[in-house]
Amino acid sequence: MVLQNDIDLLHPPPELEKRKHKLKRLVQSPNSFFMDVKCQGCFNITTVFSHSQTVVVCGNCQTVLCQPTGGKARLQEGCSFRKK
């Protein structure tokens, strides 16, 4: 008897793994990461922690790059980023 809700435990879908707690995944991995954020005004690149608890400003023009929230930091409009 095969049920529709059967999933392969050795090869779970990535979207299911992403929703699990970081310690209950098949391969444990943290939710946080460092990222390079490009300032929208002067195009300076700053390294920022994804779960930053303080306001991060650009080193050159003092523009706010990201605001802390309860979890991940929220990037300002127009800022682009990439994971490191």
From Swiss-Prot:
GO cellular component entries: cytosolic ribosome; cytosolic small ribosomal subunit; plastid
The keyword Zinc-finger is annotated on this UniProt entry: yes
The protein, known as: Small ribosomal subunit protein eS27w
Zinc finger regions, C4-type: 39-61
Keywords from the named record: Metal-binding, Ribonucleoprotein, Ribosomal protein, Zinc, Zinc-finger
Top-level taxon in the UniProt lineage: Eukaryota
Reported cofactor(s): Zn(2+)
Cross-referenced HAMAP family: Ribosomal_eS27
GO molecular function: mRNA binding; structural constituent of ribosome; zinc ion binding
